[in-house]
Each structure stands twice: as C-alpha cells, then as structure tokens.
C-alpha cells in the first residue's frame, strides 16, 4: 500500500456569536447595549516538517476541525479566538481540493506554512447597533461559519537522485549499502511498495539524498500494476541512476529493460525523458561469461550515458559510481525542478462567497431565498423585537433581495421563505 496519497476532510472554526447584553446604569435605556463581539474561528494551517517522510498519520485520521471562536459576553467583553489547528506534512506535499481538483498548495520549503481552511469571522455584539432611534437593540450578529472542504494530499518525493529500474534488479540492496536506510529486501516483484530515502556520504565528503523509487513494469504510464504511484516519485529528482541486472538471472536483456523503462518515463511525462541518467550495471559478481555488459556499454556510449559495473552485494564499483553522481549533481545545482503553479485565487473561494451571493427561486406559490449570509442573518434576528425586525428588512433591501423579488414579479400577500422562516410580502 502506498502512503503517498491521502484524502482528508477539513473544517475550520466558526466565528463566535455576538452577545446581546446591557449595562446597569441610571438614566440609560435598558442599561445601554454592552454585548461584546464573538471571537474569530481557528484556521487550519499546514506546515512543512523536514522530519516527516510519509503521509502515514493521515491514514488513521481523516477528519480535522479547528476550534470555534467563543461567543461574545456582557460588559463589552469579546469572545476568545479559536485556536488554529496545525497539520504537519512532509516536504513535497501537494494539496488539492478534492471536489474540483484545483491545486491549493505545493509545499516544498522547510517550515513553510499555508492556511488551507480559514476560520470564520466573529459576530458583532449589540453594542454596534445602537443609534439615535434604536437605544436598546435586542439583537446581535452571529459568527460566520468556518470553511469546510475535502482535500487530497499527494506526496511527491523530494530527493536529489532517484533509483529506477524493473523490480528485483537490486535497487533496495544498493540503497541499503550506500546509505543508512533499511528497506525491506526480498526476491520477488514489487518488493518495494513505498519510496525509501537515504543520505549518501561519499569518500570525497559530499552528500546527497538518494531515493529508491518503487519498481516499474511495462504499461506503468497507464497505471498498470502500481505504475502511476511509482512514476509520481520520479518527477522531482535531478538525476536518475538506472539500475540494470547485467547478470540476466531472470533471463532479462538489460538493454531491452533500459529502453522499456525509459519509454514508460517518457509516456508518463515527456520531461522525464530528458532527465540526466547514469547506469548502474548491477550483479557483476554473478555475471559469469556473457556479453551483456559489453553490449550495454557500447550501446549507451552512443547516447552519451555512462555505465558503471557494480555489485550491490559486494560493494564493488560503488565508490566510483557515487563520486560520479556527486560531481554530476554539482553541475546541476542551478537546475530547478519545475513546480505546479499554485492557484492563489482558489484558497478562499468559500469565504468570498459568504459576502453577498444569494439565490431566489419560485416553488409553487412561495419564493425561496438562500445564501450563506442569510443563514447568519436569520440566526441573528429576534423576530419578536421591532428594532431587530427593522434591521432584518434593511439588510434585505441593501443586499438587493427585495429588488430581485420584484423582478420575479412578487405581489403583496405572497410568501417568502428564507431557510426556516416564512413570511408574507407587503410592499
């Protein structure tokens, strides 16, 4: 099972409701308004953690909620803001909105932070609604709902060098002897199901991150086997070490394998076909008398690709291979791996829709009006209080709802329904 993709549900905190409260003072109607504002809802923030290597944590928990803001209080006391929820992810994590597929964030830098779900604003207390004609407002405004969305997390492995090749050619063994990584090693296809990372330190004193990319098979670019998941990890490496079995233990032709794997890389992503490569001709310790190595070296020399005879089992030839890779990486230092462009405008779509958007439709003899801000307004209105009712009507006019009802031909005596509240319309 791959641990490089996960789907999770996010819900940021709701803003706290404004309070209806009054002071106790002489000669002030009803004591004067003193309801404080609600606190802001908590954000959900993703932070890059260099110590993480997988999305394993998100396999065991799928729902994440930030804290709601506290409601306002009397004596003009504001509610406390909800605490932000911090979710830590490995470097290289891509976040997409599951519903639309839009790219929300591409997190690569250490300690990089990104707000993915923004907390709702706190509501206004009744202290804000006092006027010359409204001395003791009996209403306040509810807090705004937090954003709620499902996202897909995708980990694109960040490594300097990737080991590619068919299953069972010795990639995991190679990684284990040149780094401190301890991948599972066995003689069967698809041995490596998740990428393994290790840090190589050469005798020259250089170091780089090496990734054992899970094995490929023909048809991988179409998703055959575990193809798409495997190929996804190759995209951000600067250089590839193509591991081939020159001993031909399973009857394979190393040159044919080289061509097949490169064709899969090209079909998956055209840019991968131009990624610098070096070949590790592995299992020379059990090669015996065959022409595979000579044939391979001559054919790849025409393509300008270096071939290093090695044995991961005996460590023969590995120092020369790693020194070459280290030098090559220095030549590629200025090469930047292309990242997908982050669509910044997609970050707070849900928040933007809360402000003024509404819909009006007629069903039978009733006009149905809906909108996020209207749900808030209904929750905030005291329909037994004339001041509150007057404010409610004022908002309907200011937001253009009355004009829209008129365009649809509403007449006096017809019914309007806004969520759970239904009333007769009179001009």
UniProtKB/Swiss-Prot annotation:
It is found in: Cytoplasm. Residues 347-427 form the OCT domain. Its cofactor is Mg(2+). One of its GO terms (cellular component) is cytoplasm. Its EC number is 3.6.5.-. PROSITE patterns: G_OBG, GTP1_OBG, OBG, OCT. Transmembrane segments: none annotated. Keywords: Cytoplasm, GTP-binding, Hydrolase, Magnesium, Metal-binding, Nucleotide-binding. One of its GO terms (biological process) is ribosome biogenesis. Its main location: cytoplasm. Residues 1-158 form the Obg domain. Mg(2+) binds at residues 172, 192. InterPro entries: G_OBG (IPR031167), GTP-bd (IPR006073), GTP-bd_Obg/CgtA (IPR014100), GTP-bd_prot_GTP1/OBG_C_sf (IPR036346), GTP1-OBG_CS (IPR006074), GTP1_OBG_dom (IPR006169), GTP1_OBG_dom_sf (IPR036726), OBG_GTPase (IPR045086). Pfam families: DUF1967, GTP1_OBG, MMR_HSR1. GTP binds at residues 165-172, 190-194, 212-215, 282-285, 311-313. GO terms for molecular function: GTP binding; GTPase activity; magnesium ion binding. Residues 159-330 form the OBG-type G domain. An essential GTPase which binds GTP, GDP and possibly (p)ppGpp with moderate affinity, with high nucleotide exchange rates and a fairly low GTP hydrolysis rate. Plays a role in control of the cell cycle, stress response, ribosome biogenesis and in those bacteria that undergo differentiation, in morphogenesis control. Monomer. Belongs to the TRAFAC class OBG-HflX-like GTPase superfamily. OBG GTPase family. This is GTPase Obg. The gene is obg.
